[in-house]
Amino acid sequence: MVCESNNKSYLKSQNLKIIGKNSLRGNVKISGAKNSALVLLAASLLTDEKIILDNVPLLTDIEKMGNILKNLGVKLHNKDHQLIIDSKNISIQELPYELVNGLRASFFCIGALLTRFGKASLPLPGGCNIGERPINEHINGLRALGAEIIIEKEVVKAKLIKKKSKLFGANIRLNCPSVGATETLIMAASLAEGRTIIENAAREPEIQDLCQMLNKMGAKIYGAGKEKIIIDGVQKLHGCSHKVIPDRIEAGTFLIAAAATSSSITISPVIPNHLEAVLNKLEESGSKIEKKGNSISISGKSIKAVKIKTAPFPGFPTDLQAPFMALMTIAKGTSMISERIFENRMHHVNLLNQMGAAITVDDNTAIINGVKKLKGMNLVGSDLRSSAALIIAALISENISHIYGLEHLDRGYENFEFKLTKLGAKIIREVDGGIQTKSKNSSEIHPTKNLDINFNVA
């Protein structure tokens, strides 16, 4: 059983045609957080009662995760941005590789399935090609909880140790604050017997969102957002309603786009505390920031060079490293951006240089000498965030750019070009050299809302 989408596939021939040098102005509605929604979908497997999720973003990654759940026998019903999940009648089976390929979040299911049913079998996950993202921390942690795990032919097979009816609490110290491992172990420990303590845990807002939903379901989790998380296992979790937090990465991307184009926009809803590191660097680079309730306004001015090192939350997020580098290409002076999370996340450097940027890379540090202008090019984004960086670069470039590789963009940005166009950008999605959607006024450029997920089919 699979879901149906208005777009059956994302053709590599699709591209965004972008006319640069247009300022942005207005308000942007920020979607629900992709990285939160994905793990919350996995967490729904922990109960046989219904979970109602609101503010779910319409993204291809959400579509893929929904297909994974449906393959397990989960019933899904969605309307707009609400998703009702019924995991009562699950059939535990090995998921086909083609279903999980390209979606690293699929591996989140292993902790939930293992702790609820005593076994799980998943192919090794995929995702963006941005370097090694090993699952050693996940596996070592699950073993500490009492799981027996083997890897055969790229498939991870987990089960309870013989004579044990469930997982048992343990003290676990992560070698690094892995977000995925922290989330996987929290889910597994929620139904384990006894207390689990995770030290050196990741502190990201998405983890806090997961723990908030699990506690609504009856879990006993303490310390979310801190380096030490305590989970007292319970016998059973029940259903709940939960609203996905706003996407801080999407929010940051729009703020960076406004700064790059010397524009004034307001984004909402957002949680400003989730964006402190980004806001600090935007202010340092010359933008004026105003926070009011659940909204942030930015006024871009002359751009100054800054130094950035990516770091786990509350540090500067690695997912905004590429977009911020696009901003720094036209900054006054020399900027330095060091990537400290992933060892191979500089694919966008060569692409930005083709547009006229002056960037060199030494190990995992990019040195950006600001230039006066960029030029429009035809380029292919290599991953989700590099695609966003190229779009920002195209917005500030002279002439016209065509950005390909939209299958990456649509994984993580809901109606990205539609939102930009409402702000005044000149963007249209083309397919095979033709316009996918036209406005009544041919002089205007309007993109398509490119994904309409429908899980309400057998």
UniProtKB/Swiss-Prot annotation:
Residues reported in the UniProt entry to bind UDP-N-acetyl-alpha-D-glucosamine: 104, 319, 341
Annotated active site: 128 (proton donor)
NCBIfam families in the cross-refs: murA, PRK09369.1
One GO process term, biological-process aspect: UDP-N-acetylgalactosamine biosynthetic process
Name the record gives this protein: UDP-N-acetylglucosamine 1-carboxyvinyltransferase
Keywords attached to this entry: Cell cycle, Cell division, Cell shape, Cell wall biogenesis/degradation, Cytoplasm, Peptidoglycan synthesis, Pyruvate, Transferase
Pathway: Cell wall biogenesis; peptidoglycan biosynthesis
GO cellular component terms given for this protein: cytoplasm
Annotated source species: Prochlorococcus marinus (strain MIT 9515)
Primary residence: cytoplasm
Enzyme Commission number: 2.5.1.7
Membership in a protein family: Belongs to the EPSP synthase family. MurA subfamily.
Gene Ontology terms, MF aspect: UDP-N-acetylglucosamine 1-carboxyvinyltransferase activity
Pfam families: EPSP_synthase
